[in-house]
From Swiss-Prot:
It is an enzyme of class 2 (transferase). This is Glutamate 5-kinase. It comes from Gloeothece citriformis (strain PCC 7424). It is found in: Cytoplasm. Keywords: Amino-acid biosynthesis, ATP-binding, Cytoplasm, Kinase, Nucleotide-binding, Proline biosynthesis, Transferase. The keyword Cytoplasm applies. Gene3D superfamilies: Acetylglutamate kinase-like, PUA domain. The gene is proB. The keyword Kinase applies. GO terms for biological process: L-proline biosynthetic process. It catalyses: L-glutamate + ATP = L-glutamyl 5-phosphate + ADP. Catalyzes the transfer of a phosphate group to glutamate to form L-glutamate 5-phosphate. GO terms for cellular component: cytosol.
Amino acid sequence: MTKTIVVKIGTSTLTEPETGQLALSTIAALVETLTKLKTSGYQVVLVSSGAVGVGCGRLSRKERPKDIAMKQAIAAVGQGRLIRVYDDLFNTLGQPIAQILLTRRELIDRRSYVNAYNTFAALFELGVIPIVNENDTVAVEELNFGDNDTLSALVANLIEANWLFLLTDVDRLYSADPRLVPTAQPITFVNPSDFAHLQVEAGSGGSGWGTGGMTTKLAAARIATSAGVRMVITHGRQPQNILKILEGEAIGTQFEPQPRTENARKRWIAYGLMPMGKLYLDEGAVKAICQGGKSLLPAGIVRVEGDFVDSEAVLLCDGEGKEVARGLVNYKSTEIDKIKGYRSAQIALLLGYMGEETVIHRDNLVISERKLS
């Protein structure tokens, strides 16, 4: 069976830190590595940051813009140059590429999500390496990915990848930032049971040009491993290490995946959608859902948070506010607020009409990875 690899490279690796100009030697090494993987029989996707950083360099700007409109304009300048460089380098090796620009909107809508999957499948059939970036030019703030670490994990989930490599400016995960704390301990392997107890001073900031930091990489690892994808953090200046890692060398930090048991639709619910609110449940409802595999009934709901409509995604939380599941609701928030705590037989009396007996049917409900661990 053909294996699929997603490789994400960050702005700090793609560009020279002093100037923001493209680090062409690094990009050339990356292109050569990805082409070797493709020739070896892998299906390869590259998630590339850098549009804003390259745009800043092209326009001789010293700082990343904070204004949304300016950021989107500069991304439009940088994306064209970035994809041209990739195309020129891949073309010298005879490897065709495609550009795919995504926003969260494409993953929220089920039909668009399936269309995106089919597009990737067709590109693989054509022998093409897709290059993915967030469509910064049109993404609205509440529907953006926020960083390409998250985007790469969601893409890996979408296409059912086997591996996700995050190429960054450190060689692996450490207990603290090794650039600031010389005694920081390297972490080479993380299994699912250890993930929840991982002690890492991750911080929140990335490089001056990027948007990610180690916090976003750990969030990406949670998405990827929960979806059955093995993830690796390794240094981006040596992309050839990807080949060595695939051959079994202990380079970087590897995150062992959980078994991929959920169907494609449930993975979409779990990772493709943005929760628009929360439902707080009593202990009986939590047990029925998490241990009994039951649907969510109105009687088990204690509190409603957020403003949402039917068919949107929400988080289900226990009495302490911890996420236990997420799913698609059959009622809007104002209706759930009226029927919470009541039996399903009373819905018609409370709302004036009889809708679904369940607030969330079990077919539209996914147990949280945190609750399973």
